[in-house]
Structures are given as structure tokens and as C-alpha cells.
Amino acid sequence: LMGNVQSGKTSHMFGLIAAAADQGFNIFVLLTTDNTLLQEQTFKRALADLDTFCVCGENDYIRFQANALRKPVLLVLKKNVHVLQQWKNNFSSTNFCAGNPLFIVDDEADAASPNTKVNQKDVSAINRTLNAIKKTSSSSIYLQVTGTPQSLLLQTKIAGWKPQFIYYFA
């Protein structure tokens, strides 16, 4: 999903999340940059716009577990390796993800998510952890959202991060 700055990408993300919930998806992860203010802003907006969801922040594991998928859950997480590793462990330790597809929305997908160590024949920590999170469920959808898609479009197909299709709006 590609759009200009301040073009309504967040509204489109929330609309897609709501539509996917209507189709039976129960677990959503919305990744923000590693900026606390942006993560909190997105979290507050999700609380307001997705009021039929159990919206959780990075420290809301008890709320996530208590919900027990009675309502669709949206986790708003920073792209921070420690936060992502903790939630990967949380997913692995519960049965919620085992039989349910995982819908991941990566806001600013060109920041931190692609493997930044590909030229060193290594895998960056965030990229490795995101791959591990995807593997905690039976299947996953990974939606990349950006206003600057160049690094995503230049990914190799074997990297597994190159978009299969692009939806652009202005």
C-alpha cells in the first residue's frame, strides 16, 4: 500500500484491518517505527477508530491473553527488536496463533523491516524477528505500507520481502 505523505494511509490501514476482521481474521499486528510518540499516536487512533477490537500496546500481554480472541485483537508495536522478540515469545507460548492466520501491517515498511545486512551475508535482527513472528501462525499476510517504496521495490524475490503487488492512492 503506497501513498503520499498525509494522504490517508492510516485510515486505509484501519479500513483493511476492519474488513479482514469481517472475513475471520482475529490477530493483527500493526508495526510502527521505533518512535515512542508515533507508536502512542497510532495506538490512540486505533483505540478510537477500531472500538470493537481489543487494542493492545507493547506492554499489554495480560489484556491480549484475557481477551482470548473473543474480539479481534490489534497489537500496535514499535519496530524494536526487544519488543518484537517479546511478542514472538508471547505468540509462541499461547495457542492463539497456532490455528489462526496472522495479519501484519507494517507502517513505514521501508524503515527497519528489510534485511539491512544482506550485503554482509547476514540477517538484521528486526528482519530475523519479523520472519520468526510470521512463522508463529499457520499462515500470515504481510501488508507493507509506505510513502517511499524504493527500498521495497529493489528487494530480490528470494528475500521474501519484495511486494507481490502495489496499490497506490494519492
Where in the sequence are the language-model features?
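Hydrophobic anchor at the beta1->P-loop junction of P-loop NTPases
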Residues: 1
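P-loop (Walker A) phosphate-binding loop of NTP-binding proteins
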Residues: 4-5, 33
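Catalytic P-loop NTPase motifs of RecA-like helicase/translocase cores
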Residues: 8, 112-115, 152
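Motif I (Walker A/P-loop) of helicase-class P-loop NTPases
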Residues: 10-18
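Conserved Walker A/P-loop ATP-binding site and its immediately adjacent core
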Residues: 12, 25-50
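Short, surface-exposed basic-aromatic patches at helix termini and helix-loop junctions that form
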Residues: 18-23, 45-51, 90-98, 131-137, ...
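Conserved RecA-like ASCE ATPase "motif II neighborhood" in helicase/translocase motors
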Residues: 57-108, 112-133
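Conserved P-loop NTPase catalytic core
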Residues: 70, 100-101, 106, 118-170
